[in-house]
């Protein structure tokens, strides 16, 4: 499957799962009309467009992602949103970096992809206005459902998939955040949302799209899929529902401190 198809597949699945969790989290982050926001790791832009709606025409959202195919899909999908721009970028290279440009930097399920988190926090700090804040939603461990899916549906690729992730404990994230100069406003765990898939093909597509194509859908035989769904889903037939109960992800909101950072 091509990278463009992967990006489109990501758009189709993220429109539900990640947007649902992201919207819930944004109630705490509280973007305001007129805000300038950086959406760091925007994917195909579903939450970016929602942020643009929240800040209104007097505000602006700059959305960046290192995956150019996802950026192209985002640009084509949200052409009518005039206060939103999509650009290729990363945690170490984004518009306005180091220039105190943004009121909020939003980062939704991106932290586990970034090896150098200390650099990320320093870059975010220097890119916020004096009254700015960051709003991060992240996983500090491999979610249980994902771990089962990778090991049972794609055992041939499990090591490659694990090596893609750079999880950090919540306490470790908080420590790096404070070291960069932030004051933590809120840091808490949230129950992971349930996952529902219309059929087996949507399960294959979901894990393929969310691993940048490393998860191979062609290795998911009907026997593997049936066994997986029988073990973990609720009910006997499609749509397949997998409960998030007992699993969690983390959220962090932190404000730019007026105090100087020693050694910063």
Regions found by a protein language model. Name each.
Residues 1-35, 46-50, 69-73, 77, 135-157, ...:
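Conserved class I S-adenosyl-L-methionine
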């Amino acid at each position: 499957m091509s990278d463009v198809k992967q990006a489109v597949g990501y758009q189709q699945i993220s429109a539900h799962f990640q947007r649902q969790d992201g919207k819930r989290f944004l109630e705490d982050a509280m973007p305001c009309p007129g805000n300038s926001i950086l959406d760091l790791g925007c994917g195909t832009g579903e939450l970016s467009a929602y942020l643009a709606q929240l800040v209104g025409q007097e505000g602006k959202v700059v959305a960046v992602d290192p995956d150019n195919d996802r950026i192209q899909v985002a640009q084509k999908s949200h052409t009518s949103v005039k206060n939103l721009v999509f650009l290729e970028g990363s945690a170490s290279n984004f518009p306005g970096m180091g220039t105190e440009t943004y009121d909020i930097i939003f980062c939704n399920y991106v932290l586990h992809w970034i090896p150098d988190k200390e650099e990320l926090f320093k870059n975010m700090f220097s890119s916020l206005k004096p009254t700015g804040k960051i709003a991060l939603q992240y996983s500090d461990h491999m979610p249980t459902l994902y771990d089962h899916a990778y090991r049972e549906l794609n055992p041939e690729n499990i090591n490659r998939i694990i090596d893609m992730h750079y999880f950090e404990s919540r306490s470790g994230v908080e420590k790096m955040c404070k070291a960069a100069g932030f004051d933590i406003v809120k840091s808490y765990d949230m129950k992971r949302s349930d996952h529902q898939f219309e059929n087996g093909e949507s399960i294959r597509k979901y894990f393929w799209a969310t691993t940048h194509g490393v998860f191979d859908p062609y290795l998911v035989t009907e026997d593997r899929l049936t066994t997986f769904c029988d073990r973990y889903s609720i009910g006997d037939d499609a749509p397949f529902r997998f409960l998030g109960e007992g699993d969690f992800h983390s959220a962090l909101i932190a404000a730019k401190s007026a105090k100087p950072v020693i050694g910063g």
